[in-house]
Curated annotation (Swiss-Prot):
Official protein name in the record: Protein adenylyltransferase Fic
Subcellular localization(s) per the UniProt record: Membrane
Domain remark from Swiss-Prot or TrEMBL: The fido domain mediates the adenylyltransferase activity.
Topology in the lipid bilayer: Single-pass membrane protein
Pfam families xrefs: Fic
PROSITE patterns, alphabetized: FIDO (PS51459), TPR_REGION (PS50293)
Membrane-spanning residues: 36-55
Length: 495
């Protein structure tokens, strides 16, 4: 019987080949630690990358939030309205970090000097309340003002001073402003919230009444025929006044007489810089452009604003005139948007200017908001204030109002109200523009009346003009009486 033959075994590979086929034991054992090291390094690198992206994202939000600190998102502040320069979607994206920043700022520690001022302010506040309860309102008022000067952003000081103004001084408008500021700083302050809920509707009604009274004066001025000699003289004088005060707000030292001389004769004034001359000539060019073109236009475009600015800086800086800035700028405590955001923000501003919603606003409110929006964006390297005031007056003129004169004597108030708008409350700035509008209307109505007195704006002595303007800053007795009767009635309805 045959058997299956055994297969010969394959020849053994050479020793060198066998070493390559079967690597040393120590190399195979070290593959697992090496693989583990790579995984750990990959995990660490991924974690660092994720943390870096998160940090950059948060830092970007914080940087943008610093620009948005004046745009409160809490509904009870009642200021999420047409003045915001960012969209609702963008504000919602910042809400979480905004709330965190508010809580952080409320609990922030103070420096030694700041804490000393706050302690002194609180002592003054307690003394003021004692004086008020004792019926010594004058002393109480001075102590409240001292406390506010020491701690202008302390919620308790703002709240108690507001209550004093509301109940003792019957100044509900200013009281409501302080309640608002207290809420902006401390959104959870229940007393400030309750006070504001009580005063908000009354103040809104008072503001509406004020705007209606401006319409009545505007209509009275419109009834005067253009051929009226006194009206023509008043317009000419107001033209000089407008340019003089607008450049004066920015620091121009020309007197009213010198400004008039430059505009009428085109002759240089001794002892004054070329730039000061050119600022006046630039305003003259811009005013003529408005009268010849913009007043008749239905819509105001970015190109129109650039053309306006080009004339404002045409003699001072023709290279930058009519061009958006290319650098970051800083205006006091306000940090305007970066140059990379200007194109988008100006496009939104243009849409808002010509929107159907804006057309429903009162002309003074609309013009003041446009002024604030543009000066907040701060699109130019220089001339933002002058251009914003010119745009404001363009919108007012289209609604039948004369160009508003903001007196240079009111420069500090003007900037103060812009600062309050940056902090969240646009209403004081709108009221300030309404005050200036009323004074300008009074200028024309007084000039065209049969009254023998000169009006404050037309007095040739500038010190007299400033003194008379200061007197007009406060409402007269009849106006105060009307406001008090309305508020004390408690009805909240117009009489």
């Amino acid at each position: 019987m045959g058997t299956e033959a055994e297969q010969p075994s394959p020849p053994s590979p050479p020793a060198q080949q066998q070493e390559q086929t079967n690597p040393p034991l120590w190399n195979a054992q070290n593959q697992k630690p090496a693989r583990l090291y790579r995984l750990v390094l990959f995990f660490i690198a991924g974690s660092l990358a994720a943390w870096t992206i998160h940090a950059l994202s948060n830092s970007n939000l914080v940087w943008k939030l610093r620009q948005l600190h004046h745009l409160p998102t809490a509904h009870y502040l009642q200021t999420r309205d047409e003045f915001a320069v960012y969209s609702v979607e963008e504000l919602n994206a910042f809400k979480e970090i905004y709330d965190k920043s508010v809580s952080d700022s409320v609990g922030a520690s103070y420096t030694k000097d700041e804490q000393t001022s706050i302690n002194e302010a609180l002592v003054s506040l307690r003394m003021a309340q004692d004086m008020y309860l004792a019926g010594k309102d004058d002393k109480a008022s001075r102590l409240f003002e001292h406390a506010l000067a020491l701690a202008p952003r302390h919620p308790e000081v703002l709240l108690r001073y507001g209550e004093f103004l509301e109940h003792s001084q019957r100044n509900i408008v200013l009281a409501d402003q302080y309640y608002f500021q207290a809420l902006t700083i401390s959104p959870s302050n229940s007393e400030a919230l309750a006070n504001r809920q009580r005063t908000a509707d009354v103040v809104q009604t008072l503001d509406e009444r004020r705007l209606q009274s401006l319409d009545s004066k505007r209509d009275a001025l419109s009834a005067i025929h253009e051929s009226n000699g006194a009206l023509r003289r008043a317009k000419k004088e107001a033209y000089f006044q407008h340019i003089y005060h607008s450049v004066g707000i920015e620091g121009n030292t020309m007197t009213l007489a010198q400004t008039r001389s430059i505009l009428e004769t085109r002759m240089a004034v001794d002892g004054k810089s070329i730039d000061e001359h050119n600022e006046i000539l630039g305003m003259d060019l811009a005013m003529k452009y408005i009268n010849a073109s913009l007043v008749q236009k239905i819509d105001i475009t970015i190109k129109d604003i650039l053309e306006l600015h080009r004339r404002v800086l045409g003699h001072v800086d023709p290279i930058e005139g009519g061009e958006f800035r290319r650098n970051q700028v800083y205006v006091g405590g306000h940090v305007p948007p970066g140059p990379g955001d200007l194109a988008l923000l100006m496009q939104r501003f243009e849409r808002w200017l010509n929107s159907e919603h804006s057309s429903t606003l009162h002309p003074v409110n609309y013009a003041a908001l446009a002024h604030y929006k543009l000066v907040h964006i701060h699109p130019f390297i220089d001339g933002n204030g002058r251009t914003s005031r010119l745009l404001m007056n363009t919108l007012l003129m289209r609604a039948g109002y004369p160009p508003v004169i903001i007196p240079k004597q009111q420069r500090n108030k003007y900037y103060h109200f812009l600062k309050l708008a940056n902090e969240g409350d646009i209403r004081p700035f709108v009221r300030f523009i309404a005050d200036c509008t009323e004074k300008t209307l009074d200028l024309y109505l007084w000039a065209t009346s049969d009254l023998p007195q000169q009006i404050p704006m037309l007095i040739q002595t500038e010190s007299e003009a400033g003194e008379r303007l200061a007197q007009m800053q406060s409402p007269n007795v009849a106006q105060r009486s009307s406001i008090l009767e309305f508020y004390e009635s408690g009805s909240g309805a117009l009489p």
